[in-house]
């Protein structure tokens, strides 16, 4: 497709030698990925891809539909959302190449339904553009990070190494997602032994982020309530006769929580209208907020021998 590119990333990797007197050795590692041409400015062509495709690279090379290779630079990225925008100078692209490439047509991922037909396009295994087809297997699948989770589109189209950053298209040929991960039997998104479980980032969820990154702006850093603690799951709840939710074990001094009516021992069950079933429900919600915003926390607190409920407003920092 004229709007899809192949990406080759080069990274310096350091490894220790078997012989201690030689010391650490550096070598160049080459990775493959894909990207989607989303817009063109007066001086640059902008391409969206996964952040992990271009993370810590010393050189990024973009290959267009006519196999013309051009260097690119990172315009902006969000590690948390695994999204990056890279830029190619128009002055570096031949006129013949500019004549054949196209901007991707963007669709609305919120209109997707389970069972809808989809097309996945990417640079599978670094061999160049390839196309696979399938259906939407599930929506809003939570893929866990270290301290956060992202809601993903699950698909059964084949997703292999190098497909990351490529386009997920609906039946109209519109981009509705960015192919991002394939899960294997050990739970990683590396080589596959489980088939039919690919994942893509819903495009409508990251439209505003991509617009900001395209301008060279920093990704949102989110905001903080000023609490720490641990989750009370169903098992713990039954064992100790406590409500499920996030148990506050510490309140940071001079934080928004410290200046509110929150107390240690409170159990947060909702943040605004979001049910708190895991800590990621809180951290993901706060990621979209900024300092000065207010949130309402529904909390359970012990009163005598029973728990009562109250709503506390907290100003974020």
Language-model segments: residues:
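N-terminal activation segment of mature serine protease catalytic domains
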Residues: 1-18, 34, 58-59, 113, ...
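A conserved glycine-rich beta-strand in the N-terminal activation segment of trypsin-fold
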Residues: 14-46, 68-73, 103-105, 131, ...
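Gly/Ser-enriched beta-turn/beta-hairpin loop segments
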Residues: 14-30, 78-81, 89-98, 139-153, ...
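Active-site loop architecture of trypsin-fold serine endopeptidases
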Residues: 28-29, 57-60, 93-101, 121-134, ...
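Catalytic-histidine neighborhood of serine endopeptidases
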Residues: 42-83, 89-91, 100
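Short glycine/Trp-rich loop-beta-loop segment that forms part of the substrate-binding cleft
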Residues: 68, 106-128
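C-terminal, low-ordered peptide segments at domain boundaries
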Residues: 88-109, 114, 226, 306-317
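C-terminal recognition in membrane/secretory proteostasis and scaffolding
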Residues: 170-171, 185, 205-317
